[in-house]
Structures are given as structure tokens and as C-alpha cells.
Design a protein with these regions (language model features):
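Extracellular secreted precursors and ectodomains with disulfide-bonded cysteine-rich loops/domains
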Residues: 22, 80, 102-105
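Sec-dependent bacterial lipoprotein signal peptides
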Residues: 1-24
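N-terminal pre-ligand scaffold of iron-sulfur
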Residues: 25-97, 112-113, 129-144
Length: 144
């Protein structure tokens, strides 16, 4: 009888750890508020000066959006909110010495846009939030 109670206690403790401890991890998606928006940009007007590997800052999202042009027809759009401390409400800014590297002015985390917005250095563990993009003819749509 005593062995059965001990086994039951171990099983319940294991289930408790399996359910509660992973929930202590903060989900990146919960850090940055979800906003619904649609932004339309003309490829040959609004983005004419955006070469491959280049970036352009636009209004939108939580703290602004940075557009990264990966190839002729492939674009990525990232929210400029640092995923380490989004409550600081400070937008990441482009590192003047490296193309496609953005740095948080609060925590010093750097993000590589050519690597999916992944953190490169600093305390941030999650990539910048990426918004959906689609190119239809000469119109780039950024949406969430």
C-alpha cells in the first residue's frame, strides 16, 4: 500500500512538472501585442531605392517596421520592438557599421535580418516579430 502511494505521488509530481514548468517560459508571441494592419507599398515608387540586402524603415506595427529585401522578389518585414524588454517601447535601430544588423538601445541586443531577425548578441533570446509579406505585380503588401 505504501509503495502504491509513493508511485502515485511520483507520477503526479512528474505530471505537475511537465505542465507547470514549461509554462514559466515566456512565449515570444505574447511579448509583442498583436496588431491587425495592411500596408501597401509600390515596388518602383516607395521601394525604388531598396536594393538587395538593403533595409527601409516605415511606420506600422508596434514600434515601426523594418523591411529587408532578400532578393529581387523576396521581402521580409520585422517589427522594430526588441523581444527582450518590449515594455521599454524603444525601437531597434540600424547599426551604422553593418548592413542588416539592428540593435536595441536599451539592452544592447543585436538582430541579424539576413538570418530571420534572430538575435546575434546580447540578452535577447527570441527573433524580431516577422510580419507576412506578399508581392503581387509591383505592389508589396505587409500584413498581420
Amino acid at each position: 500500500m505504501r509503495k502504491t502511494k509513493m508511485t502515485l505521488l511520483c507520477v503526479l509530481l512528474g505530471l505537475f512538472q511537465g505542465m507547470v514548468l514549461p509554462s514559466c517560459e515566456t512565449n515570444r508571441g505574447e511579448l509583442i501585442p498583436y496588431l491587425e494592419f495592411d500596408i501597401y507599398l509600390l515596388l518602383y515608387a516607395d521601394l525604388a531605392d531598396l536594393g538587395i540586402g538593403g533595409t527601409k524603415l516605415i511606420d506600422g506595427g508596434v514600434n515601426g517596421i523594418v523591411i529587408y529585401r532578400e532578393s529581387d522578389l523576396e521581402f521580409h518585414a520585422y517589427d522594430r520592438t526588441c523581444t527582450m524588454w518590449p515594455e521599454h517601447d524603444a525601437a531597434v535601430t540600424e547599426d551604422p557599421t553593418f548592413f542588416g544588423v539592428f540593435e536595441c538601445p536599451v539592452c544592447g541586443s543585436t538582430y541579424l535580418l539576413m538570418n530571420g531577425g534572430e538575435p546575434n548578441s546580447g540578452p535577447a533570446r527570441y527573433p524580431l516579430v516577422e510580419y507576412s509579406t506578399s508581392l503581387n505585380g509591383d505592389v508589396l503588401r505587409i500584413f498581420n
